[in-house]
């Protein structure tokens, strides 16, 4: 169960029904990936992800892992494109296994110059008071950037009240507004105008 429901404009989810993927290469090197289907966002389910991933076992065994891009493309063409979370989990597990085998950290494999990464944390849909509480908890975790889910039936005025509450407890935090396709053009315009 999640600490708090993860709410977006299309609905909320109180339980994360994810799928852990393990992929073993010849030589015993194991990679891990995770599918995180979110039914309110894209309709994907845990069962769908598991079905897509299980189907890959029939053709994957014995394939060379070095050309991971070709395997990722084959995964998509053999049904993986229908479930983005399964595709992500497969690619993560494959890359993790290859990098473990080669003794190369993922960041270095992709040409990264460091080991630090700035990320954000999300304030989901909810009341202005809850948004302020969540933003304060994010700041207490020393996360600077805050993503805010916006959109839904209460309209841009409600989202603006939430943003004001967040700014009140985290005035120096950059905010990322995320409507997940749940904001109309008119509501987006009203929201942007309200931010001025």
Predicted regions: what they are:
Residues 1-17:
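Short, Gly/Pro- and small/polar-rich lid/capping loops
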Residues 8-12, 73, 99-116:
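N-terminal amphipathic alpha-helix/helix-capping segment at the start of soluble metabolic enzymes
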Residues 13, 83-91, 127-132:
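Glycine-rich anion/phosphate-binding loops
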Residues 17-18, 180:
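Asparagine-centered polar/low-complexity signal
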Residues 19-23:
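Short beta-strand scaffold segments in enzyme catalytic cores
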Residues 24-101:
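Metal- or metallocofactor-binding catalytic centers and their adjacent structured scaffolds
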Residues 108-196:
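Metal-dependent enolase-superfamily TIM-barrel catalytic cores that perform enediolate-based chemistry
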């Amino acid at each position: 169960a999640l600490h708090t429901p993860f709410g977006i404009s299309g609905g909320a989810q109180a339980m994360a029904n994810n799928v852990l993927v393990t992929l073993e290469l010849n030589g015993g090197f194991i990679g891990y990936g995770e599918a995180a289907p979110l039914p309110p966002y894209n309709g994907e389910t845990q069962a769908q992800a598991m079905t897509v991933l299980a189907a890959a076992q029939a053709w994957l065994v014995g394939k060379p892992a070095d050309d991971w891009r070709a395997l990722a493309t084959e995964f998509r063409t053999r049904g993986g494109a229908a479930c983005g979370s399964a595709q992500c989990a497969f690619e993560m597990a494959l890359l993790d296994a290859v990098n473990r085998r080669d003794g190369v950290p993922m960041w270095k494999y992709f040409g990264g110059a460091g080991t630090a990464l700035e990320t954000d944390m999300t304030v989901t849909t909810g009341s202005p008071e809850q948004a302020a509480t969540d933003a304060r908890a994010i700041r207490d975790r020393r996360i600077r950037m805050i993503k805010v889910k916006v959109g839904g039936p209460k309209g841009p005025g409600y989202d603006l009240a939430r943003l004001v509450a967040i700014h009140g407890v985290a005035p120096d935090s950059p905010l990322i507004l995320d409507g997940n396709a749940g904001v109309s053009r008119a509501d987006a315009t009203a929201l942007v105008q309200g931010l001025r």
